[in-house]
């Protein structure tokens, strides 16, 4: 089966109020970035939304041409109003990573933004085209291969305890998606062994330095963090084992770990943006500017590459499609598969 389309991380949003207007397919990437920057600013991960807009925060401006073609062909329904509501809510996600809103990404708030229309037995190229969200595509040498929708239509979330799931956002409040059984399971009690915060009661996280991890209350700024974890986004456990706010540009630091994940500790021992386009990224390997990447061969920050340029991954291309044999890959126009 081929992976389903992702509409600029349509699932990376929280359930909450119903604000936000309609968002068109063309505007989806920029709206998502703006809402994500609002969240990062509010939680102290970046200094302000204006700086965030120009930072390399991991999301581009590309809309999958195959998604657009599938919508035009009627294989996928696109609802701009639901997407608008969905994206608007990301800026309101709780900075408390143990809060329910910080865990229940997607689910009913985003269901229906993109929906497949092809029934079982129908022709498909990707999972998202199918009502079952399962497209069985045989192995073939071509860039686009046609398959068949299999399975039964997927019911809308949230799912009750005991029902099959793919992610925790599929499950009802008070439950998580067990990664071993793929079934919605009741949250564990305080003190129970765990592998992920998703398993713990709201307000608690899964923590422990070595051996068994358990569900417990996580520390906040100013409190000791013997397990090396802090509760809130925008905070970290220092070398002295105390929770503190992450460093932003100009703040003193000893290592990259003292700075927000979007910044580096420079040679003056202060948090900084990192290398800009045309500058060396040999030391920290982070390029600061939106759309830039660190070229492995030259160790220089480069902008997105045009069709015909050499590449090692699709994220380096303007087309977001890098193909070819190892050592001879180039950026090309992305094939449309529907």
Where are these regions (language model features)?
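Bacterial signal peptide processing site
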Residues: 16-18
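C-terminal motif of bacterial Sec signal peptides marking the signal peptidase cleavage site
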Residues: 12-14
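Mature extracellular/luminal domains of secreted and GPI-anchored eukaryotic proteins, especially small
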Residues: 20-131, 138-159
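Secreted, cysteine-rich disulfide-bonded mini-domains of extracellular proteins
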Residues: 105-338
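Sec-dependent signal peptide recognition
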Residues: 1-8
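Short linear sequence motifs
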Residues: 2, 25, 29-32, 229, ...
